[in-house]
Design a protein with these regions (language model features):
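Mature catalytic domains of secreted/periplasmic carbohydrate-active enzymes
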Residues: 2-458
Length: 458
């Protein structure tokens, strides 16, 4: 996919590794619909290289940052008239958290006005290199964006004060314990918010993250901007508002998990097609996304404490204006916290507030965190973000198999309690995912785990 990329003047220009001209025996993993984008791996041979064609409207210096994984490797970035070098191993940035992916500053190169060829090569790949992307931005714009990101960042102290939260993948795929699954709108109508809030309150959780859409895109409230894209994906009942009220009465905040719905890509006229997603022309998709976020944010105001945006690898390759996305995400509540899940990669933007931390291992990863429990990464791939993790307690994110009970926790209780206490003391905020039946109830064994952590911390 050897296309010319136009330099952005107002943000970093993203050069994805998977669209580079590859010279060597690289391995590239492509998704079926080009929604989720992945890294290039098996960079093991001297002389292997990746090249991009860039059209610049100006002549001047640009900072180059690599989202890269390496072990004692040396890379060279060349435009033919300047070279930036950096040993990823010497900076020891490959050991951050539980992954050695990081954002590595490669230095400054000079671009001429017009077409440039930028090549990243390695004279010593060391233990092997993997590359997700390069980012090119002028030094002045870089400083301006860093300042704006700090100004937009929300206070996350309430998350640390909450100590921990719960996550629930309650979606169109959720199944009852027994019997036939209800259609989504009926399940929304019948959800018992008072019983649910009482259960959450007993666990001691200070907030919940409710998954509004996962594999399938639905939303449990009457949202016009969603209906405008595709009718039949919302509900008459505003379950989100009802949950805000019931949880607020218990001193519990509500956050929402959001998935853009790319799993619908196989449907010829389905949700994904109608969103306007197009990797080479993302304006319609981003406009639709911003409209949805703005409407939801203004509808719930301060009642909506945060967003958890899954699949950052869908957003980032579109090279969006993350400041614009952040403004939409915080519509109605400038203090709302947001994150873009980077999976194994480093942070995709500074225009966010907390690190996703998908997986139990992040509960035990304290690198780059100060010992005072303040919980903000001082360096590394998630620098300046609030430490957070979300993980599965039982078997799955969502209870989507009919006629079976929720399985018991996969983690021994003693180990779970100790890991939770250690993480919370370090300032990490855990969101524990509990499987949930369609009627809004959970496993007694799992909720007992959570009541135990409440008792332990009291």
């Amino acid at each position: 996919m050897w296309n010319t990329v136009k330099m952005k003047w107002d943000r970093p220009t993203v050069l994805m590794a998977d669209i580079a001209n590859l010279s060597g025996q690289f391995s590239v993993w492509y998704s079926g619909n080009w929604a989720k984008r992945f890294h290039v791996s098996q960079w093991n041979q001297e002389g292997d290289s990746l090249s991009w064609s860039i059209e610049s409207g100006f002549s001047g210096k640009v900072n180059v940052t690599a989202l890269i994984k390496g072990d004692g490797a040396e890379v060279q970035l060349s435009t033919g008239h300047s070279i930036a070098k950096n040993r990823t191993g010497e900076q020891k940035l490959t050991k951050t958290i539980s992954t050695n992916w990081n954002r590595v500053d490669l230095g400054i190169i000079h671009l001429k006005a017009g077409i440039n060829t930028v090549t990243l090569s390695s004279s010593r790949p060391g233990g092997g290199l993997e590359l997700y992307s390069l980012e090119l931005v002028s030094p002045d714009i870089r400083l301006c964006l860093e300042k704006q990101a700090v100004e937009m960042r929300s206070d996350t102290s309430w998350m640390r004060e909450s100590k921990y939260g719960l996550q629930f993948h309650w979606t169109s795929e959720s199944q009852p314990r027994y019997g036939k699954q209800k259609v989504y709108a009926d399940a929304v109508r019948d959800f018992d918010v008072q019983s649910f809030a009482q259960m959450v309150n007993q666990t001691g959780a200070g907030y919940i993250i409710l998954t509004t859409s996962h594999a399938e895109h639905y939303f449990p409230a009457p949202i016009k901007s969603i209906d405008a894209i595709m009718p039949g994906r919302t509900s008459d009942r505003d379950l989100v508002q009802d949950l805000i009220g019931a949880l607020e009465a218990c001193g519990i905040r509500l956050m929402l998990y959001y998935h853009v719905g790319h799993d619908h890509w196989v449907e010829p006229d389905g949700w994904w097609t109608r969103t306007g997603f197009a990797p080479d022309n993302p304006n319609v998709f981003i406009s639709n996304w911003c409209a949805i976020m703005t409407e939801i944010g203004e509808r719930y105001g301060e009642g909506l404490a945060g967003w958890f945006y899954d699949d950052g690898c869908v957003y980032y390759p579109l090279n969006p204006d993350f400041r614009q996305l952040g403004q939409a995400a915080k519509a109605g509540n400038s203090s709302r916290v947001i994150c873009y899940n980077p999976w194994i990669w480093p942070r995709f933007t500074d225009f966010q507030d907390y690190f996703c931390g998908e997986g139990y291992s992040f509960l035990k990863s304290h690198e780059w965190l100060p010992g005072d429990g303040s919980g903000i990464f001082t360096d590394g791939p998630h620098k300046s973000l609030q430490a957070h993790t979300n993980f599965i307690l039982e078997k799955s994110w969502c209870h989507s198999t009919p006629e079976i009970p929720i399985p018991p926790p996969q983690i021994p209780k003693g180990e779970f309690l100790q890991d939770m206490v250690n993480a919370i003391e370090r300032g990490i905020v855990p969101s524990v995912n509990l499987e949930i039946y369609q009627n809004g109830s959970c496993s007694d064994i799992s909720t007992d785990y959570m009541r135990a952590i409440k008792t332990t911390l009291t």
